Amino acid sequence: MIFASKKKFIKPRRYKRCYVVTKRVLDNIPVGALGIIALDGCQEMGKRVNDYIVNWRREDSHEFKNDVVFKGYERDNYLIDAKVPRFGSGEAKGIIGESVRGKDLYLMVDVCNYNLTYSLSGHTNHMSPDDHFQNLKRVIAAVGGKGRRINVIMPFLYESRQHKRSGRESLDCALALQELVRMGVDNIITFDAHDPRVQNAIPLSGFETVRPTYHL
């Protein structure tokens, strides 16, 4: 009972159990809607991953599948349109064709795909690992910090063979990892890293190296 005055009593109303979704609740959700960005050279693999997740989530009886808090859990497509066009000078820029605000983004890049080419000054150039890594950074820059989390899937770890210094040499792999983390990358997933200890360059960030032999 709640006292409204000395003479009158107001009986509290009983409400049915309900869930009120507020901005604070949404901010406390540990995950965001899934978004997959497959860069050039990794689009076929990205499509296969997307198709698998679409079918899996469609058949999955997730308890909160239709909950507004988990909006976007089940969709027909998780791929996000992203492009890296080049200017006549050979320079490039990253473009994302849709909103990625609040999404968990997974960027897939194959730095050893040499089949991709681009034209420069009338010559055809094959893309090097450096070109692929720069394109990855361009797409991350296009996200602009609006994604909830950024995860990079890089089957072959960029500059992984330059993991230690033998004389007056640059530590390219460590610098690349630190650069990605500074740009807002939360997790880096690779396969069979040349030396997994390179993760010491980013001890406070996620780094996963999957050994193919384990799954074979």
Label every model-predicted segment.
Residues 1-216:
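PRPP-associated nucleotide enzymes
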